[in-house]
Structures are given as C-alpha cells and as structure tokens.
C-alpha cells in the first residue's frame, strides 16, 4: 500500500512540479501610491456616475447603491 502511494506521489510531482506554483516573491510589490491614483475622483469617471446614482452595466450588479444606466 505504501509503495503504491509513493509511486502515485512521485508521478504527481513529476507531472505537476511545485516550481510551477506562483510564489509571493514572483509577484510585483504592492505600491500604495498607485492604488491612491486608481481611486482618484478626478481620473475615474465612475465616481461621477455614482454621484448621480447610476453605474455602467457590469459594476451596477455588484454595487448596491447604484442603478444600471
């Protein structure tokens, strides 16, 4: 039983090596300044639509205070 489990584990590791999994070190660093720019009301037209109470189609489904426009 144990040898079958070992063979199965070996085959799985050969077909899907652990190096194929993304690691946190491979991801770009989170830049707080870029996030602030993304939500700037002057650059994002969604804020103006939200003031009117109307959002474009894909966003109006997930946002409770918006009507679809």
From Swiss-Prot:
Secretion signal span: 1-20
UniProt record similarity statement: Belongs to the conotoxin M superfamily.
Chief location bin: secreted
GO cellular component: extracellular region
Pfam families in alphabetical order: Conotoxin
The organism of origin for this protein: Conus regius
Entry keyword set: Cleavage on pair of basic residues, Disulfide bond, Secreted, Signal, Toxin
Compartments, as annotated in UniProt: Secreted
Domain comment quoted from the record: The cysteine framework is III (CC-C-C-CC). Classified in the M-1 branch, since 1 residue stands between the fourth and the fifth cysteine residues.
Record-level Gene Ontology MF annotations: ion channel inhibitor activity; toxin activity
Disulfide-bonded cysteines: 54-68, 55-66, 60-69
Protein name as catalogued: Conotoxin reg3.6
Propeptide: 21-52
Tissue expression from the record: Expressed by the venom duct.
């Amino acid at each position: 039983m144990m040898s079958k489990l070992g063979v199965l584990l070996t085959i799985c590791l050969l077909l899907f090596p652990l190096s194929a999994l993304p690691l946190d070190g491979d991801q770009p660093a989170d830049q707080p300044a870029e996030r602030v720019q993304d939500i700037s009301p002057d650059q994002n037209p969604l804020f103006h639509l939200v003031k009117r109470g109307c959002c474009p189609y894909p966003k109006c489904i997930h946002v409770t205070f918006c009507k679809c426009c």
